[in-house]
């Protein structure tokens, strides 16, 4: 175990160095050995990805070596060769001889042995993500919002994958940091997009990817275990958008419906206005409450059933009144069952 840990630590240091000026002393042979080392660790990742003890031992040691430019997790070994290659390609300090040899080392052609070990697809994916992010950043406010959200969601998903492991502590720390430091509305929008990534993916293999399901579960767990974030998520997202997300994740739909019923109890009936009104500024207005419940009903048949069962149960507990204004549950059911459009 210890030799493997040392190998990984040393490669993490090399990965950090590949961004700096020290590569000016590298020749073609050194670049070749560095790439071989990265591919060896790719085999290590594939062999031990499902072994919890090995992952935990490596996860504990990696952040301390190589700094932020090195390996951040055991899962990062899966793309270590591509990251190394991309950094060398971008580093103008790389010695000329090594720079000339690098393309042939990365793309040896169809006659090369072990073609599945060549980082072509992983390199292309990283390069595309990096280029897309840089382009969107340069466009600034002119960037299409859907493209920006999609790119940020894919980057978040990739980062959660890199954190790896069954322990979600590292994922939660990352998400908490984003929530604390980032623009909160944007974090909520990116979270929603990330939860829809595989549901909207046209490729069946992507939509059923078990590894991707791990990232989704980490994101869902963070959302459901953070009351402040969950409440903000369920208030900020447009009704139709949130209903689409809830329709893909039953635990979220249940939590969302619980919040809506809680917010409903805070409204009171104003006899003079003949309407349900908030008691405090932060309460959800009647019109928005109805719109969100309608959107849930229209999203999926099972959601409509859950909403109606919940409201009927609440109505029965509240006295089963049929007179308008006596019970908010009665009036909500009238809106939903009669199909009154509030959009």
UniProtKB/Swiss-Prot annotation:
Pfam families: FANCF
Domain of life: Eukaryota
Protein name: Fanconi anemia group F protein
Keywords for the protein's UniProt record, in alphabetical order: DNA damage, DNA repair, Nucleus
Subunit relationships: Belongs to the multisubunit FA complex composed of FANCA, FANCB, FANCC, FANCE, FANCF, FANCG, FANCL/PHF9 and FANCM. In complex with FANCA, FANCG and FANCL, but not with FANCC, nor FANCE, interacts with HES1; this interaction may be essential for the stability and nuclear localization of FA core complex proteins.
Gene name linked to the record: Fancf
A Gene Ontology cellular-component term: Fanconi anaemia nuclear complex
Localization, UniProt: Nucleus
Function description: DNA repair protein that may operate in a postreplication repair or a cell cycle checkpoint function. May be implicated in interstrand DNA cross-link repair and in the maintenance of normal chromosome stability.
An individual GO BP term: spermatogenesis
Effect of a null allele: Viable with no gross developmental abnormalities or significant growth retardation. Gonad defects are present in both male and female mice. Testes are devoid of germ cells. Ovaries show premature depletion of primordial follicles with almost complete loss by 14 weeks of age, and aberrant estrous cycle. Significantly increased incidence of tumors, particularly ovarian tumors.
Upper lineage: Eukaryota, Metazoa, Chordata, Craniata, Vertebrata
């Amino acid at each position: 175990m210890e030799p493997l840990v040392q190998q990984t630590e040393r490669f993490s240091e090399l990965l950090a160095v590949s961004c700096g000026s020290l590569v000016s002393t590298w020749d073609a042979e050194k670049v070749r050995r560095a790439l071989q080392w990265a591919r060896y660790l790719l085999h290590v990742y594939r062999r031990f990805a499902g072994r919890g003890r090995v992952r935990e031992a490596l996860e504990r040691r990696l952040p301390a070596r190589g700094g932020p430019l090195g390996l951040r997790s055991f899962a990062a070994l899966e793309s270590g060769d591509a990251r190394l290659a991309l950094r060398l390609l971008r580093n103008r300090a790389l010695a000329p001889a090594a720079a000339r040899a690098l393309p042939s080392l990365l793309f040896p052609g169809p006659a090369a042995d072990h073609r599945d070990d060549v980082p072509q697809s992983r390199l292309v994916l990283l390069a595309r993500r990096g280029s897309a992010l840089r382009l969107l950043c340069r466009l600034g406010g002119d960037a299409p919002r859907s493209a920006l959200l999609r790119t940020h969601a894919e980057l978040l998903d990739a980062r959660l994958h890199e954190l790896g492991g069954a322990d979600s502590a590292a994922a939660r720390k990352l998400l908490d940091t984003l929530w604390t430091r980032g623009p909160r509305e944007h974090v909520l929008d990116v979270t929603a997009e990330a939860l829809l990534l595989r549901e909207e993916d046209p490729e069946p293999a992507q939509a059923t990817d078990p590894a991707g399901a791990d990232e989704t579960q980490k994101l869902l767990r963070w959302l459901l275990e953070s009351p402040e974030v969950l409440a903000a998520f369920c208030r900020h997202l447009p009704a139709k958008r949130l209903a689409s997300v809830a329709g893909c994740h039953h635990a979220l739909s249940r939590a969302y419906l619980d919040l809506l019923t809680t917010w409903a109890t805070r409204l009171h009936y104003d006899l003079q206005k003949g309407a349900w009104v908030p008691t405090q500024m932060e309460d959800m207005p009647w019109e928005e409450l109805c719109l969100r419940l309608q959107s849930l009903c229209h999203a999926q048949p099972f959601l409509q059933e859950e909403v109606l069962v919940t409201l009927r149960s609440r109505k029965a507990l509240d006295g089963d009144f049929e007179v308008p204004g006596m019970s908010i549950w009665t009036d909500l059911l009238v809106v939903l069952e009669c199909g009154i459009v509030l959009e």
